[in-house]
């Protein structure tokens, strides 16, 4: 299982994070008003794991399977930092982050997804309540190990 290491909470805004990832396209609703980059408690290391299913799955089914593997749901910030540090991953197929969904303008609950269109890296929003097709990899977080003092 590949683990991707990122660090959240470096003080950048959502707009700065999106710009740093150098996407060819970013959904117009992914900005600080809708997805404010939270400060956490300073720099926060995270371990991202991508799960792949051989059949269409709901967000609920994917989250249940992730929990069985000891994984937790991501934050939307995980997607923003992941796209900066690992730009090539989305070129191999879409990556969806099943964070707490954002209620979009038309009443759809959305999650941030990273994908490519003819080799152009893109950041978009997809329906959290739709089925995720087998070509999607769903991002979850390995909980931090307790540190000993």
Model-based region annotation:
Residues 1-149:
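A binding-site-centric feature that preferentially detects glycan-recognition modules on secreted/surface proteins
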């Amino acid at each position: 299982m590949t683990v991707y290491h990122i660090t959240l909470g470096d003080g950048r805004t959502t707009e700065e994070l999106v710009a740093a990832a150098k996407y060819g396209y970013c959904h117009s609703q992914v900005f600080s008003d809708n997805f404010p980059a939270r400060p956490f408690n300073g720099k926060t290391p995270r371990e991202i794991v991508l799960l792949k299913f051989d059949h269409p799955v709901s967000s609920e089914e994917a989250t249940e399977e992730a929990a069985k593997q000891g994984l937790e749901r991501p934050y939307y910030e995980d997607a923003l930092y992941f796209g900066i540090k690992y730009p090539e991953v989305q070129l191999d197929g879409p990556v969806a982050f099943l964070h707490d969904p954002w209620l979009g303008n038309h009443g759809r609950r959305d999650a941030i997804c990273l994908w490519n269109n003819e080799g152009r890296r893109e950041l978009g929003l997809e329906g959290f309540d739709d089925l995720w097709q087998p070509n999607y990899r769903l991002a979850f977080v390995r909980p931090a190990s307790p540190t000993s003092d």
